[in-house]
Amino acid sequence: MARSFSLAKNPLFWQVAIAGIILDQLSKLWVSQAMDPVGTTWPLWSGVFHFTYVLNTGAAFSAFRGGAGWLKWLSLAVSVGLIIFAGKVPLRKLEQLGYGCILAGAVGNGIDRFLFGHVIDFLDFRLINFPIFNLADVSINIGIAALLWASFFPVSSRKVD
């Protein structure tokens, strides 16, 4: 028997996803308006953490830079898949958090890729020479961490919240 789709099935998933998308898009709007032109950097802790406005045509942390037009379609496929999954399958709270964060990141960066052909990155950890990233990337990584944590609990004792 097919499971019916319901937005009410996993409320935390939807709340996290919507909040994450809004925060990501507002942060990128702020960066694009306050830090113009591209390349502007503001040291918050000089040599350690800066806001640096860059345009990324690649994936997270600038992987596949310049040749990744397919990423917008991947973002769309992941987003549609997660929406269908969360609308049909009851999930534990930690799973809702994880999948909601991943959806927020996929949609946040997907919006940028479809509208502009690039993603705005601005979080710049210079102390460890880490690639510049954005809140959507953070959201995806939080989601992965939450799902990994949830995987430590056996499915047989799984209690849906």
UniProtKB/Swiss-Prot annotation:
GO terms for molecular function: aspartic-type endopeptidase activity; endopeptidase activity. It is a multi-pass membrane protein. Pathway: Protein modification; lipoprotein biosynthesis (signal peptide cleavage). It holds the Pfam family Peptidase_A8. It comes from the Bacteria. InterPro entries: Peptidase_A8. It is an enzyme of class 3 (hydrolase). GO terms for cellular component: plasma membrane. Its EC number is 3.4.23.36. One of its GO terms (biological process) is proteolysis. The active site is at D121, D137. The chain crosses the membrane at residues 11-31, 44-64, 66-86, 100-120, 135-155. PROSITE patterns: SPASE_II. It is found in: Cell inner membrane. It catalyses: Release of signal peptides from bacterial membrane prolipoproteins. Hydrolyzes -Xaa-Yaa-Zaa-|-(S,diacylglyceryl)Cys-, in which Xaa is hydrophobic (preferably Leu), and Yaa (Ala or Ser) and Zaa (Gly or Ala) have small, neutral side chains. Keywords: Aspartyl protease, Cell inner membrane, Cell membrane, Hydrolase, Membrane, Protease, Transmembrane, Transmembrane helix. This protein specifically catalyzes the removal of signal peptides from prolipoproteins. HAMAP family: LspA. Belongs to the peptidase A8 family. This is Lipoprotein signal peptidase. It comes from Synechocystis sp. (strain ATCC 27184 / PCC 6803 / Kazusa). The lineage of its organism: Bacteria, Bacillati, Cyanobacteriota, Cyanophyceae, Synechococcales.
